[in-house]
Amino acid sequence: TAEKHDSFISPTDGGNVIMEFSGKELVKGEPDASSFPSGGLRATFEARGYTAWDPTSYAFIKDRTLCIPTAFCSFGGEALDKKTPLLRSMQALNRQAMRVLRLFGNTDVHCVRTSVGPEQEYFLVDKEMYDRRKDLIFCGRTLFGAKPPKGQELDDHYFGVIKPRVAAFMADLNEELWKLGVLAKTEHNEVAPSQHELAPIYTTTNIATDHNQLTMEIMQKVAAKHGLVCLLHEKPFAGV
């Protein structure tokens, strides 16, 4: 995901400044798209990309900033992100599902929405140990090393007691996610050593996707406050 911050300041004819946020700014923004490959067909300053407001996803406040979820597309409407294809896929599913329902004589349903509740698995590593491993720092996973003294052969970690340090991290994580409207519901150890999981309540697909991006970001920030590092790679260690 990405961010672009705009202030609400707007100059007046008298040389003063007022706080203003227009509907035009809300509906469409114009960030830079020069980092996308163009084959050298256009100059950097002409590489326009446009943000389009996604009114179906909730706005939220993060670090005293109003965050408005948007899609990112080119001047011609081509998708420059992964959210635009998702929204179009949801519309396509709705159209075809409605068509099938009408074939069966169902005229009561007016919209079909998909929902998802993505579980987010993660590993917690002590910051001091993490700093000793350059492969973890640069790759987010180990590239070499000895086998661990304990693997995931038994169920003692999955069904074991959550360690106090991890429990404190989970409590702070839930608090921060709830502030952002992310409905974190379930947390527990996972099978591999140092692996844990957070599961939210199911919600509409595009909202759940936005929430999952927020979850991963907040996980890493909260972990740092507890002297930990959150690894989001699905298999950061060999044999996991």
What are the functions of these language-model segments?
Residues 1-232, 239-240:
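Glycine-rich, acidic/polar active-site loops that bind/position phosphate-bearing ligands
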